[in-house]
Design a protein with these regions (language model features):
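C-terminal closing repeat unit and adjoining cap/tail of repeat-based domains
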Residues: 284, 315-316, 321-369
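Loop/turn-rich, solvent-exposed surfaces of beta-rich toroidal or solenoidal domains
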Residues: 263-280, 286, 290-329
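Blade/loop signatures of beta-propeller domains
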Residues: 1-29
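Short loop/turn segments that connect beta-strands within beta-propeller blades
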Residues: 64-68, 109-113, 149-153, 194-198, ...
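Extracytoplasmic beta-rich repeat domains
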Residues: 25-45, 69-90, 115-133, 155-178, ...
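Structural signature of WD-repeat beta-propellers
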Residues: 48, 55-56, 100-101, 140-141, ...
Length: 369
Protein backbone atom coordinates (compact mmCIF):
# COMPACT_ATOMS: atom_id res chain seq x y z
CA UNK A 1 0.00 0.00 0.00
CA UNK A 2 2.96 2.38 0.00
CA UNK A 3 2.91 3.26 -3.67
CA UNK A 4 0.03 5.72 -3.60
CA UNK A 5 0.68 9.22 -4.92
CA UNK A 6 0.13 12.41 -2.99
CA UNK A 7 -3.10 14.29 -3.71
CA UNK A 8 -4.05 17.95 -3.57
CA UNK A 9 -5.17 19.64 -0.38
CA UNK A 10 -8.84 20.10 -1.31
CA UNK A 11 -9.54 16.55 -0.12
CA UNK A 12 -7.02 16.58 2.80
CA UNK A 13 -5.63 13.34 1.41
CA UNK A 14 -1.86 13.84 1.55
CA UNK A 15 -1.11 10.14 1.05
CA UNK A 16 2.56 9.27 0.90
CA UNK A 17 5.47 11.67 0.32
CA UNK A 18 8.62 10.72 -1.52
CA UNK A 19 10.71 11.77 1.48
CA UNK A 20 13.65 9.80 2.83
CA UNK A 21 15.74 12.49 4.50
CA UNK A 22 18.34 11.83 7.18
CA UNK A 23 16.72 14.44 9.46
CA UNK A 24 19.83 16.54 9.80
CA UNK A 25 18.89 19.77 11.55
CA UNK A 26 19.66 22.57 9.11
CA UNK A 27 17.87 25.81 9.94
CA UNK A 28 15.71 27.57 12.54
CA UNK A 29 13.27 30.18 11.27
CA UNK A 30 12.85 32.30 14.42
CA UNK A 31 9.98 34.55 15.51
CA UNK A 32 8.60 35.98 18.77
CA UNK A 33 7.01 33.34 21.01
CA UNK A 34 3.35 32.49 20.38
CA UNK A 35 1.80 32.27 23.86
CA UNK A 36 -1.29 30.21 22.97
CA UNK A 37 0.61 27.85 20.68
CA UNK A 38 -0.30 24.67 22.63
CA UNK A 39 -4.03 25.31 22.13
CA UNK A 40 -3.86 25.62 18.35
CA UNK A 41 -2.84 23.79 15.19
CA UNK A 42 -0.44 26.00 13.22
CA UNK A 43 0.32 25.59 9.54
CA UNK A 44 2.99 27.41 7.49
CA UNK A 45 2.64 28.48 3.88
CA UNK A 46 5.25 27.35 1.38
CA UNK A 47 5.81 29.64 -1.60
CA UNK A 48 8.47 28.59 -4.08
CA UNK A 49 11.52 28.03 -1.82
CA UNK A 50 10.25 30.41 0.86
CA UNK A 51 8.18 29.96 4.00
CA UNK A 52 5.51 32.24 5.50
CA UNK A 53 4.45 32.20 9.15
CA UNK A 54 3.47 34.61 11.94
CA UNK A 55 4.56 35.72 15.42
CA UNK A 56 2.85 36.52 18.73
CA UNK A 57 1.58 39.93 17.58
CA UNK A 58 0.17 38.66 14.30
CA UNK A 59 3.07 39.85 12.15
CA UNK A 60 3.36 37.76 9.01
CA UNK A 61 6.93 36.97 7.99
CA UNK A 62 8.17 35.65 4.69
CA UNK A 63 11.50 33.82 5.13
CA UNK A 64 13.71 32.83 2.22
CA UNK A 65 15.55 29.51 2.03
CA UNK A 66 18.46 30.97 4.03
CA UNK A 67 16.04 32.10 6.79
CA UNK A 68 16.42 35.78 5.90
CA UNK A 69 13.25 37.86 6.13
CA UNK A 70 11.95 38.92 2.72
CA UNK A 71 9.14 41.01 4.23
CA UNK A 72 7.19 41.52 7.46
CA UNK A 73 3.55 42.62 7.43
CA UNK A 74 1.40 43.47 10.44
CA UNK A 75 -2.20 44.57 9.95
CA UNK A 76 -3.30 44.94 13.58
CA UNK A 77 -3.85 47.90 15.90
CA UNK A 78 -2.06 48.15 19.25
CA UNK A 79 -5.15 46.82 21.00
CA UNK A 80 -5.50 43.92 18.57
CA UNK A 81 -1.84 42.99 19.00
CA UNK A 82 -2.41 42.63 22.75
CA UNK A 83 -5.05 39.99 21.96
CA UNK A 84 -2.27 37.89 20.38
CA UNK A 85 -4.19 36.75 17.30
CA UNK A 86 -3.64 33.24 16.01
CA UNK A 87 -3.62 33.09 12.22
CA UNK A 88 -4.96 30.50 9.77
CA UNK A 89 -3.33 30.76 6.35
CA UNK A 90 -3.93 29.68 2.76
CA UNK A 91 -2.60 30.83 -0.60
CA UNK A 92 -4.00 31.27 -4.08
CA UNK A 93 -1.22 31.88 -6.61
CA UNK A 94 0.27 35.22 -5.41
CA UNK A 95 -2.43 35.99 -2.83
CA UNK A 96 -2.18 35.04 0.86
CA UNK A 97 -5.53 34.61 2.65
CA UNK A 98 -5.58 35.09 6.43
CA UNK A 99 -8.37 34.43 8.97
CA UNK A 100 -7.70 34.80 12.69
CA UNK A 101 -8.82 34.16 16.25
CA UNK A 102 -10.01 37.77 16.79
CA UNK A 103 -12.54 37.82 13.91
CA UNK A 104 -10.44 39.53 11.22
CA UNK A 105 -9.77 38.20 7.75
CA UNK A 106 -7.70 39.76 5.01
CA UNK A 107 -5.59 39.22 1.91
CA UNK A 108 -1.95 40.07 1.19
CA UNK A 109 0.24 40.12 -1.88
CA UNK A 110 2.65 37.23 -1.28
CA UNK A 111 5.37 38.86 -3.39
CA UNK A 112 5.75 42.02 -1.28
CA UNK A 113 3.47 41.56 1.77
CA UNK A 114 1.22 44.50 0.85
CA UNK A 115 -2.35 44.45 2.15
CA UNK A 116 -4.97 43.95 -0.59
CA UNK A 117 -8.12 44.16 1.54
CA UNK A 118 -9.23 43.56 5.14
CA UNK A 119 -12.61 42.70 6.72
CA UNK A 120 -14.13 41.84 10.09
CA UNK A 121 -16.44 38.97 11.00
CA UNK A 122 -18.90 38.83 13.90
CA UNK A 123 -17.09 35.79 15.36
CA UNK A 124 -13.54 34.47 15.54
CA UNK A 125 -12.39 31.83 13.08
CA UNK A 126 -11.41 28.28 14.01
CA UNK A 127 -10.90 26.17 10.89
CA UNK A 128 -8.61 25.46 8.04
CA UNK A 129 -9.11 27.69 4.99
CA UNK A 130 -9.96 26.14 1.66
CA UNK A 131 -9.59 27.98 -1.66
CA UNK A 132 -11.68 26.95 -4.65
CA UNK A 133 -11.57 28.92 -7.90
CA UNK A 134 -12.32 32.58 -7.02
CA UNK A 135 -13.66 31.84 -3.53
CA UNK A 136 -12.35 30.83 -0.12
CA UNK A 137 -14.13 29.06 2.71
CA UNK A 138 -13.63 29.18 6.48
CA UNK A 139 -15.70 28.25 9.56
CA UNK A 140 -16.06 30.51 12.60
CA UNK A 141 -16.51 29.75 16.30
CA UNK A 142 -20.32 29.95 15.92
CA UNK A 143 -20.19 26.88 13.63
CA UNK A 144 -21.00 29.01 10.58
CA UNK A 145 -19.27 28.26 7.29
CA UNK A 146 -18.53 31.37 5.23
CA UNK A 147 -17.90 31.69 1.51
CA UNK A 148 -15.90 34.83 0.64
CA UNK A 149 -14.61 36.38 -2.57
CA UNK A 150 -10.82 36.23 -2.93
CA UNK A 151 -10.87 39.47 -4.93
CA UNK A 152 -12.37 41.77 -2.28
CA UNK A 153 -13.40 39.71 0.78
CA UNK A 154 -17.11 40.14 0.06
CA UNK A 155 -19.30 37.45 1.64
CA UNK A 156 -21.03 35.43 -1.08
CA UNK A 157 -23.00 33.15 1.23
CA UNK A 158 -22.89 31.56 4.69
CA UNK A 159 -24.42 28.50 6.30
CA UNK A 160 -25.02 28.30 10.05
CA UNK A 161 -25.14 24.98 11.91
CA UNK A 162 -26.03 24.17 15.50
CA UNK A 163 -23.89 26.00 18.04
CA UNK A 164 -22.82 25.54 21.66
CA UNK A 165 -21.79 27.94 24.41
CA UNK A 166 -18.46 26.16 24.86
CA UNK A 167 -16.09 26.66 21.93
CA UNK A 168 -13.96 23.84 20.63
CA UNK A 169 -10.17 24.19 20.81
CA UNK A 170 -9.83 21.71 17.94
CA UNK A 171 -9.51 23.28 14.51
CA UNK A 172 -12.48 22.43 12.30
CA UNK A 173 -12.10 20.80 8.91
CA UNK A 174 -13.21 21.50 5.33
CA UNK A 175 -12.93 19.47 2.12
CA UNK A 176 -14.15 20.19 -1.42
CA UNK A 177 -14.88 17.86 -4.33
CA UNK A 178 -17.00 18.10 -7.50
CA UNK A 179 -18.51 21.49 -6.55
CA UNK A 180 -19.57 20.19 -3.12
CA UNK A 181 -18.08 21.47 0.13
CA UNK A 182 -18.08 19.30 3.26
CA UNK A 183 -17.31 20.54 6.78
CA UNK A 184 -17.62 19.44 10.39
CA UNK A 185 -18.62 21.52 13.39
CA UNK A 186 -17.75 21.46 17.08
CA UNK A 187 -20.60 19.08 18.02
CA UNK A 188 -19.86 16.43 15.40
CA UNK A 189 -22.23 17.33 12.58
CA UNK A 190 -20.90 16.77 9.06
CA UNK A 191 -22.58 18.94 6.43
CA UNK A 192 -22.47 18.93 2.61
CA UNK A 193 -23.33 22.09 0.66
CA UNK A 194 -23.35 23.27 -2.93
CA UNK A 195 -20.18 25.33 -3.43
CA UNK A 196 -21.78 28.00 -5.60
CA UNK A 197 -24.85 28.93 -3.55
CA UNK A 198 -24.45 27.18 -0.19
CA UNK A 199 -27.59 25.07 -0.59
CA UNK A 200 -27.83 22.10 1.77
CA UNK A 201 -27.26 18.68 0.19
CA UNK A 202 -27.13 16.56 3.35
CA UNK A 203 -26.21 16.71 7.02
CA UNK A 204 -25.26 13.93 9.42
CA UNK A 205 -25.20 14.43 13.22
CA UNK A 206 -22.60 11.83 14.24
CA UNK A 207 -23.16 12.21 18.00
CA UNK A 208 -26.91 11.57 18.08
CA UNK A 209 -26.46 8.77 20.66
CA UNK A 210 -24.21 10.80 22.97
CA UNK A 211 -25.68 13.08 25.63
CA UNK A 212 -25.24 16.83 25.14
CA UNK A 213 -22.76 17.29 28.00
CA UNK A 214 -20.41 14.74 26.46
CA UNK A 215 -20.57 16.41 23.05
CA UNK A 216 -19.02 19.55 24.55
CA UNK A 217 -15.71 17.71 24.99
CA UNK A 218 -15.72 16.38 21.43
CA UNK A 219 -12.55 16.54 19.37
CA UNK A 220 -12.63 15.28 15.79
CA UNK A 221 -9.94 14.57 13.24
CA UNK A 222 -9.81 16.36 9.91
CA UNK A 223 -12.14 15.08 7.22
CA UNK A 224 -10.35 13.15 4.46
CA UNK A 225 -11.91 12.29 1.09
CA UNK A 226 -10.84 9.33 -1.03
CA UNK A 227 -12.80 7.98 -4.00
CA UNK A 228 -16.19 9.38 -2.91
CA UNK A 229 -15.81 8.23 0.72
CA UNK A 230 -15.22 10.62 3.64
CA UNK A 231 -13.13 9.31 6.54
CA UNK A 232 -12.71 10.83 10.01
CA UNK A 233 -12.52 9.87 13.69
CA UNK A 234 -12.97 11.41 17.12
CA UNK A 235 -12.12 11.10 20.82
CA UNK A 236 -15.39 9.25 21.47
CA UNK A 237 -13.89 6.02 20.11
CA UNK A 238 -15.50 6.32 16.66
CA UNK A 239 -13.98 6.09 13.19
CA UNK A 240 -16.39 6.79 10.32
CA UNK A 241 -16.58 6.13 6.59
CA UNK A 242 -19.41 8.09 4.92
CA UNK A 243 -20.58 8.13 1.31
CA UNK A 244 -19.83 11.64 0.03
CA UNK A 245 -22.85 11.75 -2.30
CA UNK A 246 -25.45 11.00 0.36
CA UNK A 247 -23.92 11.05 3.85
CA UNK A 248 -24.93 7.41 4.29
CA UNK A 249 -22.74 5.48 6.73
CA UNK A 250 -20.54 2.98 4.90
CA UNK A 251 -18.99 1.60 8.10
CA UNK A 252 -17.99 2.61 11.61
CA UNK A 253 -15.39 1.08 13.91
CA UNK A 254 -14.04 1.73 17.41
CA UNK A 255 -10.87 3.80 17.18
CA UNK A 256 -10.03 6.72 19.48
CA UNK A 257 -8.10 9.27 17.39
CA UNK A 258 -8.27 13.02 16.69
CA UNK A 259 -5.46 13.32 14.13
CA UNK A 260 -5.84 13.30 10.36
CA UNK A 261 -5.73 9.75 8.92
CA UNK A 262 -3.78 8.94 5.76
CA UNK A 263 -5.26 6.87 2.93
CA UNK A 264 -2.69 5.01 0.83
CA UNK A 265 -3.99 2.55 -1.73
CA UNK A 266 -6.53 0.33 0.05
CA UNK A 267 -5.17 1.10 3.51
CA UNK A 268 -5.97 3.74 6.11
CA UNK A 269 -3.24 4.70 8.58
CA UNK A 270 -4.13 6.37 11.86
CA UNK A 271 -2.73 6.70 15.38
CA UNK A 272 -4.80 6.47 18.55
CA UNK A 273 -4.72 8.87 21.47
CA UNK A 274 -2.86 6.29 23.58
CA UNK A 275 -0.14 5.66 21.02
CA UNK A 276 -1.11 2.72 18.82
CA UNK A 277 -0.47 2.73 15.08
CA UNK A 278 -3.49 1.21 13.33
CA UNK A 279 -3.82 0.13 9.71
CA UNK A 280 -7.34 -0.52 8.43
CA UNK A 281 -8.84 -1.85 5.23
CA UNK A 282 -10.61 1.19 3.77
CA UNK A 283 -13.37 -0.85 2.11
CA UNK A 284 -14.52 -2.84 5.13
CA UNK A 285 -13.09 -0.90 8.07
CA UNK A 286 -11.48 -4.09 9.38
CA UNK A 287 -8.27 -3.61 11.32
CA UNK A 288 -5.26 -5.13 9.57
CA UNK A 289 -2.56 -4.35 12.11
CA UNK A 290 -2.10 -2.68 15.50
CA UNK A 291 1.35 -1.72 16.80
CA UNK A 292 2.30 0.01 20.06
CA UNK A 293 4.53 2.93 19.04
CA UNK A 294 4.63 4.57 22.50
CA UNK A 295 6.35 1.50 23.95
CA UNK A 296 9.62 3.39 24.54
CA UNK A 297 7.97 5.95 26.82
CA UNK A 298 7.92 5.23 30.55
CA UNK A 299 4.49 4.15 31.79
CA UNK A 300 3.98 7.11 34.14
CA UNK A 301 4.84 9.66 31.44
CA UNK A 302 3.05 7.83 28.67
CA UNK A 303 -0.44 8.61 29.99
CA UNK A 304 0.31 12.33 29.59
CA UNK A 305 1.60 12.07 26.00
CA UNK A 306 -0.63 12.33 22.93
CA UNK A 307 0.06 12.24 19.19
CA UNK A 308 -0.14 15.58 17.35
CA UNK A 309 0.10 14.53 13.70
CA UNK A 310 2.11 12.50 11.23
CA UNK A 311 3.29 12.27 7.64
CA UNK A 312 4.16 9.18 5.64
CA UNK A 313 7.49 9.19 3.82
CA UNK A 314 9.13 6.74 1.44
CA UNK A 315 9.95 4.17 4.12
CA UNK A 316 9.12 5.85 7.42
CA UNK A 317 6.26 7.46 9.30
CA UNK A 318 7.16 10.70 11.09
CA UNK A 319 4.99 11.42 14.14
CA UNK A 320 5.11 14.35 16.55
CA UNK A 321 3.81 14.34 20.13
CA UNK A 322 2.57 16.76 22.77
CA UNK A 323 5.81 16.39 24.76
CA UNK A 324 7.91 17.72 21.89
CA UNK A 325 9.18 14.46 20.41
CA UNK A 326 9.51 13.25 16.83
CA UNK A 327 9.02 9.49 16.41
CA UNK A 328 10.45 7.73 13.37
CA UNK A 329 8.46 4.58 12.61
CA UNK A 330 9.23 1.87 10.06
CA UNK A 331 6.30 1.46 7.67
CA UNK A 332 6.77 -2.25 7.05
CA UNK A 333 7.06 -3.35 10.69
CA UNK A 334 5.22 -0.52 12.43
CA UNK A 335 8.01 -0.38 14.99
CA UNK A 336 9.21 2.84 16.61
CA UNK A 337 12.86 3.03 15.50
CA UNK A 338 13.91 6.34 16.99
CA UNK A 339 12.70 9.19 19.20
CA UNK A 340 14.15 12.67 18.64
CA UNK A 341 13.70 15.47 21.18
CA UNK A 342 12.62 18.62 19.34
CA UNK A 343 11.32 20.60 22.32
CA UNK A 344 10.10 20.19 25.87
CA UNK A 345 6.51 21.12 25.04
CA UNK A 346 3.97 20.60 22.28
CA UNK A 347 5.17 20.89 18.68
CA UNK A 348 3.22 20.94 15.44
CA UNK A 349 2.57 18.04 13.14
CA UNK A 350 5.33 17.57 10.55
CA UNK A 351 5.13 19.22 7.13
CA UNK A 352 7.03 18.09 4.04
CA UNK A 353 7.89 20.46 1.21
CA UNK A 354 10.46 19.92 -1.56
CA UNK A 355 11.98 16.92 0.20
CA UNK A 356 12.50 18.80 3.47
CA UNK A 357 10.67 18.23 6.75
CA UNK A 358 9.44 21.16 8.86
CA UNK A 359 8.23 21.22 12.47
CA UNK A 360 6.84 24.31 14.21
CA UNK A 361 7.66 25.20 17.83
CA UNK A 362 6.20 28.15 19.74
CA UNK A 363 9.06 30.45 18.68
CA UNK A 364 10.73 28.82 15.68
CA UNK A 365 10.26 26.52 12.71
CA UNK A 366 12.87 23.79 12.36
CA UNK A 367 13.83 22.55 8.92
CA UNK A 368 15.37 19.12 8.38
CA UNK A 369 16.80 17.62 5.20
Amino acid sequence: FINSKRKNNLDNNAGRHDFGGELIKKLNYKFSKISNFHQNEPKPIFFENDLIFFDKKGSLIRFNESKKKVWISNNYTKTEKKSKPFLYLAKNQNILIVADSISKFYALNIINGDLIWTKNNSSSFNSEIKIYKDKFFVTDSQNTLHCFSIKDGREIWSHKTENTLIKSEKKLSIIINNNVIYFNNSIGDVTALDVQKGNLIWQLPTLRNIIYAESLSLKSSDLVLDKKIIYFSNNKNEFYALEANSGILRWKTKINSVIRPKIIGNAIITITQNGFLIILDKVSGNIIRITDIFDKFKEKKRVQIYPVGFVVGAKKIYLTTTNGRLLIIDIKTGKNEKIMKIDGDKISKPFINKNKLFIIKDKAIIRFN
